[in-house]
Amino acid sequence: MKMKAKWLPIAAAVTAALASQAAFAVDFHGYFRSGVGVSTDGSMQTGLSDNAKQKVGRLGNEADTYGEIQLGSEVFNKDGKTFYVDSMVAMTSNGSNDWESTESKFQCTSANGTALDGCENKEDATFALRQFNVQAKGLLGFAPEATLWAGKRYYQRHDVHISDFYYWNISGAGAGIEGIQAGPGKVSFAWVRNDRSGTNDGWTYNDEMNVNTLDLRYAGIPLWQDGSLEVGVDYAIANPSDAQKDSANAQYKNAKDGVMLTAELTQGILGGFNKTVLQYGTEGYSKTFAFWGDGSWYGAEAKDGADGFRIINHGVIPMGNSWEMGHQLVYGVGNDMWDTNDKWETMSVVARPMYKWDDFNKTIFEGGYFKDKNKSTNGTSEEDAGYKLTLAQAWSAGSSFWARPEIRVFASYLAQDKKEMKGNAFNNGTADDTWNFGVQAEAWW
């Protein structure tokens, strides 16, 4: 009897935990990609350009291990009012070893373990808290269908999947009201913090500048059959501290607020879709369009009067029973972003046709080309350009373009056409082309 009595508290705790689990069912979602690859000179080389996979496509052009784990649960539901708690952690690494952690280590050491001069103190893996927020419905009498939210979250992100290119994404810590029915569409408003730091766009200043983004969107506007429109405005408020205003750094003192306007037309085609996007921005948003940004960072240091625009067309369209095609066209411009800059242009073309042999077996080709041009105020200009060609054989859980999990074997050829700004991109700066071979898995759920 004593033994039975000893286990009673444990049994009660387990029972309570199971009951709690039943009462608050947990939603489990995630994403990952990982694999192995080599190039003609060591491990895979993907540095054709800055933002290379966004410019020439991601297939056979990703050398990392990346994952997201999302857990969420509706913790309250009564009288039409609900509260949902959402969370997500993410990790990234280069996949070079079995044990990859955040433990700091030196890349090279002497015999006694002392770091040698010029060696980098490095971590194998990086972990990040991507989402932690509360979403509540039914609380607003004037809009019971709307969601009141606060915390850190992915916020209405717009992207091109084949290049992993996010072009409208102010995700971060903030608050807002989402999905207010207004006529044929829905209105959303958010306030999100997007500080300018040295991790954005290679900016070299260590002292972060506070930037707050106000976002207003009107989505789901019906136009014609299978056609809809979404429009939005983002207002970035540069908020330097008193110390930054008094510093000798003019980029802090002279930081200006900026506006980004976005319009996205979506057209359904043959069971697929095509999107055309027009964006215009002032001040720091000029750098967003020149350097493949999405609105989640603001180039507050841009010269007073800078502006820019971007045109995007992308989609995935079925072509008969056996073929599907994904594509991307991008043209972006930034004007007068710094003292010697007159105009920066960037353009990209990516196409990914896919042939389905059966419900689980497909062959994929992806080709991409890009060009960057920097024109200076003295009339001179520099250009970088290059391309990628990838052939892959894939096995996936279904025949759709979007079917995942997927395992793919690939071969990629990357080459530079022009290298006036970057120089040789491969083989430690000695070559302008390379081959990559590898195997990759990708899944979302």
UniProtKB/Swiss-Prot annotation:
Its main location: membrane. Induction: By maltose. InterPro entries: G_neg_Bact_CarbUptk_Porin, Maltoporin, Porin_LamB, Porin_LamB_sf. It holds the Pfam family LamB. GO terms for biological process: monoatomic ion transport. It is found in: Cell outer membrane. The keyword Transmembrane applies. GO terms for cellular component: cell outer membrane; pore complex. The record marks Y31, Y66, W99, F273, W402, W444 as: Greasy slide, important in sugar transport. HAMAP family: LamB. Involved in the transport of maltose and maltodextrins. This is Maltoporin 2. The lineage of its organism: Bacteria, Pseudomonadati, Pseudomonadota, Gammaproteobacteria, Aeromonadales.
